[in-house]
Each structure stands twice: as structure tokens, then as C-alpha cells.
């Protein structure tokens, strides 16, 4: 299948329907019948593919830009038979390759980025190219095309280890590693373009997003993908430290609703937290998944807690999370086969993969 600079042709539906489970609760931000033209960078990735799906559901024409370095074409297979989606395999940092795709676009959802901690320590140039240069390229393309709104996927990692919980948007930025730094620098560019060039922008700081289609690549990363692959393999969960650390896990459809609400609002030049506002311990996650555990050393540079103050987004957009952790875990278990071919981590392979983490962040 030729995909570069061509209409994306969906080939088959996914074996598990991840579109309906849990998405009945994303009413805010999804208004069927809107006739917008939207563009999603990173639209074949985890969060991006869910945004694409929601945009099509409400009646948009959608352009997807993704270089497939971490995204998967299979994440868009469920859109079988839809001719309202155009897919282009391009590097967002290549301005000349992407600029024409922004013509006539109303809303841009800039989700594309290189993620994960360890690879960013090992490959800082690559992360700057994707997350900073790529963001500037997207901003310039949006500005040149006269795009009406741009929503940027910022990261809660900008807070580092905060002084206060719940953590408000006014907390100081203390990025602990190159990924966090590049996402924060990208956010500052977005807000700067909004101020200088009058481009209507909103930055949403995502907290610990999870849900169907979360990444299954070989990089050691988010806890849900690791645990689900271990559960499928009948292996113990590798719990960092004593498991008492808490995370503000936020279900992906709640994140999608926040993105669409921000895009459809008149709010501009603002950064807002997007989170459940209900931190859950890793031990509680293990309890919900069921299974044995093995403990591995606690890592430097990781907060004991992530816990967002969501007062601002609730006040400005009326957004509130809908999916509880219990509901979210049940949805993941119903779709667990998605992680069938994901790598199965053990204490030894994790120690090897995180060697640079301890070396540079200790």
C-alpha cells in the first residue's frame, strides 16, 4: 500500500473494538455534525488515533501526518471504509513536506512527539529534532495557512518533582531529562507563536495517559503496557520500589474530550492540566489487574506522586474526567490482545534498559 502523500485506505477492522468501550462518556468536546477540516500530527499513534476517531465521529474531514516511527497504521484500521481521512507518512520537522497539508485546515491537534525517558537521554539530538524543530515546523505551517486553532499535547513531566500537590499550572518547570525538556520547550514555542503571531493556541499538559492502543514498542516505558504484556505471558509484574508511588492516571478518551473542547473553545494562549485528579498507587493497579509481583529498584528523577490540580481546565472549559481507574482497567483487559506481541520485561532486561537512567539521573 502506498501511503506517502496519498489517501489512507483502511484495510481491515481491529480484532478488538476499542472505539466504543469507554467512549460513551466523552460527550463534552464531541459535537456531531460539525463540518470542520482538522489535522492531527501523530495521528497513527496512541492518543492521536483516538483523536482522529472522535473527529470523524463528529463529522470532520481529517488529515493525518505521521512518520510511523512510533505510530502504527493498524491503529487506524478500525476506520474501514471512511473516505474522510487522508494519511501522509511525513516527518513533521520537514516543513516543505508538510506545509501544503495545512491549507484549508480549521483545527490542528499537534500530538506527534518522541516520548520516553531513556531514549531521550541516549538520543538528545533526535528528541530535539522531533519535539522542538518539529513543533516549530508545525507552528509555521499552521501560521502560513491561517489555521483557526492549534492544540498542543504538552507533558506533565515539565513539573519534574513538584513542591505541591495537587500541582497547579503555576508550579515551576523542572524537567528532569531531555524528553521533559523538549516537550516543555515545545510548549513555550507554541505559546510564543500565539503571542507574537496571534495564532490561537492552547497547550494541554497530559498526566499519565492510558487506554487501548497505548504503545507496544520495544522501548521500556509506561507501566500499563509493561504490566499487560507481563500478564499475557504469565509473568510477575515488575513493580518499582515498594509500589506505594501514585500516578494521576488519565484515560485516553477523557484526554480526547479535553482536546476537542479546547479546540472548540474561545480560550487561547493558555496551558492547562489534563488529569483524573485522583492519584492511584501502583499497588492498587496491580490489585486491579491481578497477579504476582517482583520488586525492582526505585529510579532517580521520578516523583513519588503525580497529582494535578484541574481547577483551571474545569473553570475555563467545563471539562471533567469521566472514566474511573476501575472502568479504565476493565476496558484494557477487554482489549488485552493488543499487547500480545509487546516485549515482556523482567528485572534483568529492565536493569539493562535503564542503565543510562541511573548513570545520568542519580
Label every model-predicted segment:
Residues 184, 209-225, 233-235, 240, ...:
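Glycine/proline-rich active-site loop of Rossmann-fold NAD(P)-dependent oxidoreductases
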